[in-house]
Structures are given as structure tokens and as C-alpha cells.
């Protein structure tokens, strides 16, 4: 048995090292790609300072802004379908007797939501106050990550399955961007994807932080009395957890308005899935390859990317709940050992009890969760499942309505 434990330690260390590299590469790739695209579309005033390794507010060159604005205006004017896209937002008002009224109505609602969400995203990214808040939150995350590394060493990726799901989601997001025939929904998907990518990178770091604290409590708190260094690190980690909880509350202020846009995607989802169902079951003159090609290039990206994004956030939320419950359990076990601690350091016991009380209050008053639409709506897997079934049922209802009224989309 001792031989087995001796073999397990290097295996665990090598796995931890590999997961540490994977976390660093994945988070760095997500953040750098998002940053390059953000700087490329010339919005906002955020910039990374490589010397101090933090984000700063740096106004863009006036000529860069003017040239970028001119190119954006020319691109919109050059887009032949741009006027047609704007007209589709008000078309049902003037054609209420048309056979395609239902299709036009669904299309108009989707267009109106897309225009509204794009305007909101663009205004936020150009707002100086929003930029400052975003920069402060990013720097808080960088600072917390550095503090935890200094105490626990390199952090490890908590869940490879979440990273795989993110990669699959990213591929369908790219396909969704390509599927859009108009420029405005492409811009909306791009800007929304930028913010969601940064939030996913934060979720990966957040999970790695809590997992590292759990591992420290699991492997560094033996049955015998903890040494002075372990007790000092335990108190530091509890203080850092309090900071993590406070930073997460600040991040939610920026995230909730964006999360509401994820829910508003249900209109586009219903439209895309109703077309997918129609093409699969009712276009019998088309071959399987023709159906698949049409669905793939027009509706598949928009039908799967928002669902996978919601599922990803829900899985992250459920993992956070599980890890915080485990952390609470481990702190309870440490609390039960206070009879041993009292023989060592009465000051440690008083500080630990105070920090544990703070932890219990934060866990109940402001738990680390992923909310959507409001602070009272938690975005876990049950919500993601409800979102999926709501999409499917409404899509089937749309198809039934079209069949009952003999509405043809050809």
C-alpha cells in the first residue's frame, strides 16, 4: 500500500502540471483573441499595458477613430440588404393581410431585438464609465489570480469537459456569424460573443480558484495539528475568498444586462428551429444532402450556438454550487478540530471563527452564482433545460400554425 501512494503522488503532480498549462493556454487564448478582435473593430478605450500587466483606459487616436467610423458607414451603405433588413422590422404593420404575415411578424420581432441589442452593446463598449468599470473588474481578477498563485502555486483547470463544450460552442458561434445574411446580426453576434468569451474565461479562473482552495484544505490539513504556515495560509485563503465573492458581485453588475440578451435570443432560436423542423420533416422533394446543406448554411449555427452558450453557463453555475458546498463542508471539519487548535494558538482560533462567520454570511447572502435576467433568477442546468424545452415547444407550435394556415416558406 505505501508503494501505491508513492506512485500516486508523482502521477497527481504530473496531471496537475498538465492541467495548469491547459488552464493558462485556454484562458490566454480566449482573452487575447477577444482583445485583438475588440481592438480591431475600434470600439471603446480599453488597452492592455504589458509593462504593468494590467488593463488601462487609453483614448484612441482621433484619426484612427475617424477612419474607422468612415469605414463602418461605407460598409453599411455598401451592404445592399441593409435597407431591406431595416424595412423588415416594420413590414408587418403594412401587410397584415399577406399570406406571409406570420413569418414577417416573427422576422420583424427578431430584427427589432437584434437592432436594440446591437445598439446597447455598441453604446456600452463606447461608454467611458462602462469601460472604466470593466477595466477595474479585469484588474481585480488579475490581482486575485496572482495572490492565489503566490499562496498555492500554479492553478489547474477544473473541468476539461467544460473546455471541450466551450470549443464546440465557439465553432457553432462562428457558423452562426457566417449564417447571417445581414450585417447588423453579424455585428450583434460578434460583440455579444466577445463579452461572453471574456465571461467564460473568468468562469474558468473562478472554478480553478475555488478548486485550488478545496485541494489545499483536502491535502494540506492532516489529522495531526496543522503547522504555523498552514494556519497562516488558511487565514489568507479565507480572506481571499471574501474578496472573490465581492469581486463576483461587482462583475454581476456588468454581466446581468448582457445575460438578458442571451435570454432574448429565444425569438431567433424559435424561428431557426421552426425552419429546421420544417426542412427535416416536410420538404420531401429535397434529398437528405440538400436538406442538410440548406440547414447547415442557414439555420444550424443560430439554432445551436445560443443553446450551447446557455448550457455552458448553467454547467459552470452547478459546478460552482457543488464546489462551494464542498468548501463549506471542509471548513466545518476544521471547525470541529478547534479543540486541537486551542492548544496551539488562541489568536488563530478567534481569527478563523471570525472569517468562517464571514464565509457563512457571504454563502447565504451573496453566493457565487451565475444569474440571468435578474438577481433572483439563477442560470443553472434546470434553467438551461427549461430554456431548451421552451424553444422546442414554441418551434413546434410555429410549425403547426403554418401547417394549419397552409403557410409556405418556399
From Swiss-Prot:
Positions annotated as glycosylated: 272
GO BP annotation list: transmembrane transport
Compartment(s) of residence: Cell membrane
A single cellular component GO annotation: plasma membrane
Highest taxon above the source species: Eukaryota
Mode of membrane association: Multi-pass membrane protein
Membrane side Cytoplasmic: residue ranges: 1-17, 94-149, 211-249, 315-378
Entry keyword Repeat: no
GO molecular function terms noted in the UniProt entry: ligand-gated channel activity
Keywords: Cell membrane, Glycoprotein, Membrane, Transmembrane, Transmembrane helix
Extracellular side, ranges: 39-72, 171-189, 271-293, 400-410
Segments passing through the bilayer: 18-38, 73-93, 150-170, 190-210, 250-270, 294-314, 379-399
Note: Gustatory receptor-like proteins are divergent proteins which do not belong to the canonical gustatory receptor or olfactory receptor families but display some structural similarity. They are predicted to be ligand-gated seven transmembrane domain ion channels.
Entry protein name: Gustatory receptor-like 36a
Source organism: Drosophila melanogaster (Fruit fly)
Gene: Grl36a
Amino acid at each position: 500500500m505505501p508503494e501505491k501512494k508513492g506512485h500516486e503522488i508523482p502521477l497527481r503532480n504530473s496531471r496537475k502540471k498538465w492541467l495548469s498549462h491547459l488552464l493558462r493556454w485556454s484562458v490566454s487564448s480566449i482573452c487575447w483573441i477577444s482583445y485583438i478582435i475588440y481592438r480591431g473593430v475600434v470600439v471603446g478605450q480599453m488597452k492592455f499595458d504589458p509593462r504593468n500587466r494590467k488593463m488601462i483606459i487609453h483614448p484612441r487616436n482621433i484619426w484612427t477613430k475617424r477612419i474607422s467610423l468612415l469605414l463602418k458607414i461605407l460598409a453599411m451603405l455598401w451592404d445592399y440588404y441593409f435597407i431591406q433588413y431595416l424595412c423588415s422590422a416594420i413590414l408587418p404593420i403594412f401587410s397584415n393581410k399577406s399570406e406571409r404575415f406570420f413569418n414577417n411578424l416573427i422576422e420583424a420581432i427578431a430584427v427589432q431585438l437584434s437592432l436594440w441589442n446591437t445598439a446597447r452593446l455598441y453604446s456600452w463598449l463606447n461608454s467611458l464609465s462602462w469601460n472604466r468599470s470593466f477595466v477595474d473588474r479585469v484588474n481585480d481578477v488579475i490581482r486575485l489570480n496572482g495572490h492565489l498563485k503566490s499562496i498555492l502555486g500554479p492553478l489547474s483547470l477544473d473541468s476539461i469537459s467544460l473546455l471541450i463544450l466551450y470549443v464546440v460552442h465557439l465553432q457553432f458561434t462562428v457558423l452562426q456569424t457566417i449564417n447571417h445574411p445581414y450585417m447588423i446580426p453579424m455585428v450583434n453576434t460578434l460583440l455579444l460573443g466577445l463579452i461572453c468569451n471574456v465571461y467564460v474565461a473568468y468562469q474558468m479562473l473562478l472554478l480553478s480558484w475555488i478548486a485550488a482552495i478545496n485541494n489545499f484544505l483536502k491535502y494540506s490539513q492532516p489529522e495531526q495539528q496543522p503547522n504555523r504556515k498552514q494556519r497562516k495560509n488558511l487565514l489568507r485563503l479565507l480572506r481571499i475568498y471574501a474578496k472573490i465573492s465581492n469581486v463576483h458581485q461587482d462583475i454581476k453588475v456588468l454581466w446581468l444586462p448582457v445575460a438578458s440578451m442571451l435570454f432574448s435570443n429565444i425569438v431567433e432560436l424559435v424561428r431557426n428551429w421552426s425552419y429546421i423542423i420544417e426542412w427535416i420533416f416536410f420538404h420531401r422533394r429535397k434529398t437528405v444532402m440538400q436538406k442538410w446543406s440548406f440547414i447547415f448554411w442557414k439555420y444550424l449555427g443560430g439554432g445551436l450556438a445560443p443553446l450551447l452558450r446557455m448550457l455552458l453557463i448553467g454547467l459552470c453555475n452547478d459546478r460552482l454550487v457543488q464546489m462551494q458546498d464542498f468548501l463549506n463542508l471542509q471548513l466545518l471539519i476544521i471547525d470541529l478540530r478547534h479543540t486541537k487548535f486551542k492548544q496551539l494558538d488562541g489568536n488563530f482560533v478567534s481569527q478563523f471563527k471570525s472569517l468562517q462567520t464571514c464565509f457563512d454570511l457571504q454563502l447565504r447572502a451573496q453566493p457565487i452564482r451565475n444569474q440571468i435576467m435578474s438577481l433572483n433568477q439563477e442560470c443553472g442546468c434546470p434553467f438551461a433545460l427549461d430554456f431548451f424545452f421552451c424553444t422546442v415547444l414554441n418551434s413546434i407550435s410555429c410549425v403547426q400554425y403554418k401547417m394549419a394556415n397552409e403557410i409556405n416558406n418556399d
